[in-house]
Structures are given as C-alpha cells and as structure tokens.
Regions:
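Short, hydrophobic alpha-helical segments
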Residues: 148-157
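Short, amphipathic alpha-helical "lid/cap" segments that border enzyme active or binding sites
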Residues: 137-148
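Short boundary/hinge segments that flank catalytic cores
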Residues: 111-113, 133, 142
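C-terminal boundary of histidine-terminating zinc-finger modules
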Residues: 125-139
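Short glycine/proline-rich, acidic loop/turn segments that cap or connect secondary-structure elements
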Residues: 110-127
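Conserved catalytic-core segment of NTP-binding enzymes
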Residues: 1-109, 122-123
Length: 157
C-alpha cells in the first residue's frame, strides 16, 4: 500500500528493496518489489539488513596470556580459528542467511549490500549521528558508502 501511494504521488527514479534474511520478511518484500515492477518503477537492487552478528574477541589461557592457536566453536554451527594473537571473529546468522541474495536473484538485480547487526551502528543512529558521518573510516561506514555509490551510479550520478 505504501509503495503504491508513493508511486501515485511522486515520480520515482527507482526503488531499493530492503529486507532481512528470514522467510517471513521476504514474503512481504516480494509483494512490494512486484508492485514496483507493475507500476514501472525500476528496482535498483536489494539491501539485506540485520545480516549476521559479528563477534570478535581474544581467548586467554589461565594465566591471562593470549592463546597462540586453537579453535572457537559456538553451538556446533559457528566456528573460527584463533590466530597467533589469540583473536577470533565469528559471524552468527541470527535471522537465517541469504534471503537478500535470493531476492536479488529472483528480481535479476544486484545485492547492493549486507548490513550486519551492530551495536556501533545502533548507538550512532540512536544518537542522531549516523555512523557514515560520525566515523567515515569505520568498516560499517564503508558498507553504507558502497550501497550509496552503487545506487548513484545506477541513477547516472
């Protein structure tokens, strides 16, 4: 309904479909994307929001020295090698995986980006200072910048 009202009130250059990875969200997103196509509004791409939670940490031995090697495993599903500094990175897919990719393939448009769950993104947004402005060199800012650059390129800007 909102998509239809938008297309009736203003001329859109294109639409970006934003979804989360789980199936229930995708069913609603499909309806909206299909409606944009019916009213001849180009779908420029898909963005997957809440696309995994990245956990980074350091593993220490009983004497508080970083482990030089090893393995971290969570729920037998997520695992990561411990590097020589004792650090590891795990990406946990809380809301499934690949929904944005599947929808972009269905529509024949690019997956513009995957925005992870992040305390950093949430805190900066809640403070009214989006991370792209407050910390432009942050890796999360780069995700947003890449999305914007792809959209601008598609629109000829």
């Amino acid at each position: 309904d909102i998509q239809l009202t938008l297309t009736q009130k203003i001329q859109l250059s294109g639409a970006v479909i934003v979804t989360t990875p789980q199936d229930i969200a995708l069913s609603d997103v499909r309806k909206g994307a299909d409606m944009f196509r019916k009213v001849n509004t180009p779908v420029l791409g898909v963005v997957e929001n809440m696309s995994g939670l990245t956990l980074k940490g350091t593993v220490y031995d009983s004497e508080k020295n970083p482990l030089k090697s090893g393995f971290v495993e969570v729920e037998e599903k997520y695992n990561s090698q411990i590097d020589e500094n004792g650090t590891f990175t795990l990406i946990i897919d809380l809301f499934k995986k690949g929904g944005g990719e599947r929808e972009s393939q269905r529509l024949g448009v690019p997956l513009l980006g995957k925005i992870p769950l992040s305390q950093t993104i949430m805190d900066s947004t809640d403070a009214g200072n989006p991370i792209s402005f407050s910390s432009p060199d942050n890796p999360y800012s780069e995700i947003f910048s890449d999305i914007v650059l792809q959209i601008a390129k598609d629109l000829g800007h």
